[in-house]
Amino acid sequence: HWGGGLWISSLDHARVGQLMLNKGWWNGREIIPEKWVDECLTPCPLSPIYGYLWWLNDAKNGMFPGAPSSAFYAMGVGTQIIYIDPENELVIVARWIEKDKMPDFVNMVLASIEN
């Protein structure tokens, strides 16, 4: 069992990430209410690093210590990740990458855009 079975391409993963980065807006149309996106990114009562199906990059407990605390991500089976970084206006899609390698990968991308 793979948790529900959302099977989409990397391009569609990126579109989901861009939609979240844009707070629900796509090409001038509100697809998802901005309030819902804000709720998705609000920590739940059980964990300060989890919202509605989105992981939050809390400075102390987040997966990406070198990334802004405003970053958030979705992670699925096989460490398929949609990483969204509002501070840098960045969406990263990575698929079938070792989970422990992902923080270094994100840090390399962030370093490349800082220079």
What role is predicted for each listed range?
Residues 14-21, 37-41, 55, 70, ...:
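Non-transmembrane alpha-helical segments in soluble domains
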Residues 4-25, 80-96:
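Active-site-proximal alpha-helical segments within enzyme catalytic domains
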Residues 74-115:
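Structured C-terminal helix/loop/strand segments within mature extracytoplasmic catalytic/sensor domains
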Residues 2, 17-20, 30, 34-47:
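Catalytic pocket-lining loop regions of alpha/beta-barrel enzymes
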Residues 1-5, 69-70:
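Active-site rim elements
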Residues 38-91:
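Active-site Gly/Thr loop motif
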Residues 24-32, 100:
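Structural helix-adjacent loops and short alpha-helical linkers that scaffold large soluble proteins
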